[in-house]
Structures are given as structure tokens and as C-alpha cells.
A protein has these predicted regions:
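Non-catalytic accessory regions of SAM-dependent methyltransferases
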Residues: 1-118
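Non-catalytic substrate-recognition/targeting regions of SAM-dependent transferases
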Residues: 104-117, 133-204, 212
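Conserved class I S-adenosyl-L-methionine
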Residues: 220-229
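Conserved SAM-binding loop of SAM-dependent methyltransferases across substrates and taxa
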Residues: 230-243
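Conserved SAM-binding motif I beta-strand of class I
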Residues: 244-249
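S-adenosyl-L-methionine
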Residues: 253-294
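Mobile active-site "lid"/loop adjacent to the S-adenosyl-L-methionine
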Residues: 290-320
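C-terminal catalytic and target-recognition region of SAM-dependent MTase-like enzymes
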Residues: 330-392
Length: 392
């Protein structure tokens, strides 16, 4: 195993159990580790401090353990058992009306670079680091042992998620099984999961609790679901008793999937219509007929150099919603950009509210659900921000 030596003083963040080692903190390497290899990390005084996956780029090492231990099948199995036991403890993995949840959430489960989502009998595994890609087969074997007959398929979906500097060429495909049965259930509602071509692992698991909250506010309201993607906010609103629900997305494919999902749950229901159209153009044209609006756009910024434009985008989008929503309306507004902080997002929304001149009150401050835990030593893991606002 190759060794990495840090510059003097650069071990302090590791002493606080932060799971990332940046390339600028490294003094030298003992040898030439390969991309994705497990390396041992030492202080400038040659004291062991951690071990983890190495890769070329800004984050040079993602820590797997703060003690010396073999990173082998037993290691992965133990980590996956811990993750599964937590999901059972919070009730999400053993809920009879829900078979959709996140089993592994990267740094939140002390497995930086790895995401595993469960959809009924299929686990979708995604690598966000070179090391997790290199170790994918042993991880899949351990996952199969931990989950037993609870899963029949493991699909690997990492063609677009590895860092661009990684000299790797992952291919999507089944590591176990091969079933095309892609219907899963969330709190009694059914939906199609497109793990072959869909975004993320095929579905946005992280909005489950926020969708459930929306259901409580939907009765007798006219609902607009912007950036609808799979349409899940829409059919939660329908179950909640909305009098009409309109779903909007610029992607015709997203609209097709939304219509399929609505039909799966509410066949022939005339309350729902879907439109393939730009969000801003639709709000300008039709926005003043709604008293419940959901703004759940894709990430406006994935890197810090895009932050300024992202905040302008959030201000513009929310300002248009404040301008159009009916008096007494409720606005659910979100940001899933990790580089946009909670304060950044609130400031953008508050500025938009002030521009509208309307009285606005916060009803809820939202975040990601419990199966997307945040490692207390890695606050960067809190990426989903949301507000529920009452607009007079």
C-alpha cells in the first residue's frame, strides 16, 4: 500500500474527522499510487492518521477509515450493514408502503464517493470517486450478502458521475440480475424509475418527506409543479385533494414520464395536465392562476465559479413566482446546489420577496430526509435547501 505524507499542520482537519484531503495538503508520495487505489496517510512526523481512496484532482484522498485496517470484503460488508441497520432503525427500510430509499449516502455514511438507492427489488449503485469505481465488484458482492433476498438486481450507473480528471471509462449495466421491472412505491404511490437514462440514480429520492408535506397543503388548491421531472410532487398534490394540477418541464421526455406516473396512480383523472415549456415563459403566461407553486429546479451551480449566476437565477425565478401566485398562496421553493449555502439561498429568496412588495411568511424550513444523513464532521453534505412560504 502506498503512503501519502502531509505538509506540517495539514493533519488538523483529519483530527476533526473531516473525510477529504485536498491535493494542496500533500507534501509527497511514497511511490506512485494508481487512480482509485487505497493509500495510507501520514502526518509530516510520519504518524499514521487515515487511509482512503486516492485520485487525481482537488480532493486527492477520500477517507475510508481513521484506523489501519484492510479495505476488503469484510470492510465493505460491515459498512453496508451499519448503513442498512440505520435505515431500519429510522423505519424507512421496513415501511410496508415504501420500498424506495437511499441505503448509502456518501460521506453521510462514512463511504465518500458512493451512493446506493433502493427501488423495490433493485439497488442502483453510483460511484462519484475513482476508488468506488475500482472497488465496485467487491462492494456489489457485499451488498448482495447484506440485503439477501430483499434485492434481486444491482444496477451500476456511473458513466457521467466520475470526476472529469479520472482516467477511467465506466460503463452502466447490471452487476447482478437484469430485471426491467422498474415500478417502485413511495408512501403508497407508485412510479416508474428510469435507471437506464434518468437523472441521478433514476429518481429523486431526496424529496420524499417534502412531497409528503406538500400533500397536506394541496386540498382544494390549484397547483403548479415547475421543473416536474418525474411528476412526483404532482401526484402527491392530487392525492391531497388538489382541484387541478399542472406539471411543467422543458424536457418532453420528463413530461412523458410524468404523464405515465400520474396515469399509474390516477388513471383518467382530468385534474392533471402537463406542458413541455420553459419555466419562465410558462410563469409569465399562466402563473397567476395558481395558489400553490412548487419550484424545484435542477442545480443552478455545480461549482463555486457559477455561484453568482446561480443566485441571480434563484432570485429571478422566485421573484416571478411571488409576482404571479394568488393572494393566500403557498410557495414550495428549493435549491439542490451544494455550493449554494442555506444563507445564500434564503438571501436570494428574501430579495425576490422584497422585489415583489408582498407580505411573505416562512411556514417550514426544509432539508434532505433522514436516509440522506449529514456527517457532523462534514457539513458540506447538507445540500438540499427548501422553504415553504405563505404569500399574502
Amino acid at each position: 500500500m502506498h503512503k501519502v505524507y502531509l505538509k506540517p499542520g495539514k493533519e488538523e482537519s483529519l483530527k476533526r474527522f473531516h473525510p477529504w484531503i485536498f491535493s494542496g495538503a500533500i507534501s509527497r508520495f511514497d511511490g506512485e499510487p494508481e487512480e482509485g487505489e487505497v493509500v495510507e496517510v501520514y502526518t509530516s512526523k510520519k504518524e499514521f492518521i487515515a487511509e482512503g481512496h486516492f485520485q487525481i484532482g482537488s480532493i486527492a484522498v477520500r477517507v475510508l477509515s481513521f484506523r489501519q485496517e484492510p479495505i476488503n470484503h469484510d470492510f465493505w460488508k460491515r459498512k453496508l450493514e451499519i448503513a442498512y441497520d440505520m435505515r431500519c432503525a429510522i423505519g424507512i427500510a421496513i415501511n410496508p408502503v415504501n420500498d424506495t430509499y437511499r441505503l448509502v449516502h456518501g460521506e453521510g455514511d462514512n463511504l465518500p464517493g458512493l451512493v446506493i438507492d433502493i427501488y423495490a427489488k433493485t439497488a442502483v449503485m453510483q460511484a462519484h470517486s475513482a476508488g468506488m469505481h475500482v472497488d465496485r465488484m467487491v462492494i456489489a458482492e457485499a451488498l448482495s450478502e447484506v440485503m439477501g433476498d430483499k434485492i434481486e438486481n444491482i444496477y451500476y450507473k456511473s458513466e457521467t458521475t466520475l470526476p472529469f480528471k479520472a482516467d477511467l471509462f465506466p460503463e452502466n449495466g447490471f452487476l447482478k440480475g437484469g430485471s426491467n421491472d422498474n415500478i417502485a412505491q413511495e408512501y403508497g404511490l407508485k412510479f416508474h424509475v428510469d435507471w437506464l437514462k434518468g437523472q441521478k440514480t433514476g429518481f429523486f429520492v431526496d424529496q420524499r418527506e417534502n412531497r409528503s408535506l406538500l400533500e397536506r397543503y394541496a386540498k382544494d388548491r390549484s397547483v403548479l409543479n415547475m421543473f416536474c421531472c418525474t411528476g412526483c410532487f404532482s401526484f402527491y398534490a392530487m392525492r391531497g385533494g388538489a382541484k387541478l394540477v399542472h406539471s411543467v418541464d422543458s424536457s418532453a421526455k420528463a413530461i412523458d414520464l410524468t404523464n405515465k406516473n400520474v396515469e399509474l396512480n390516477f388513471p383518467g383523472d382530468p385534474r392533471h395536465e402537463a406542458f413541455a415549456e420553459d419555466a419562465f415563459k410558462y410563469l409569465d403566461r399562466m402563473g397567476d392562476q395558481y395558489d400553490l407553486i412548487i419550484l424545484d429546479p435542477p442545480a443552478f451551480a455545480k461549482h463555486k465559479d457559477a455561484l453568482r449566476n446561480a443566485l441571480q437565477g434563484y432570485r429571478k425565478l422566485n421573484a416571478k413566482a411571488f409576482e404571479k401566485i394568488k393572494p393566500g398562496g403557498i410557495l414550495f421553493t428549493f435549491s439542490c446546489s451544494q455550493v449554494v449555502t442555506k444563507d445564500n439561498f434564503r438571501t436570494a429568496v428574501f430579495t425576490a420577496a422584497a422585489m415583489s412588495g408582498r407580505s411573505v411568511r416562512i411556514l417550514h424550513q426544509l432539508t434532505q430526509p433522514a436516509d440522506h444523513p449529514v456527517n457532523i464532521y462534514h457539513p458540506e453534505g447538507e445540500y438540499l435547501k427548501g422553504l415553504v412560504l405563505y404569500v399574502e
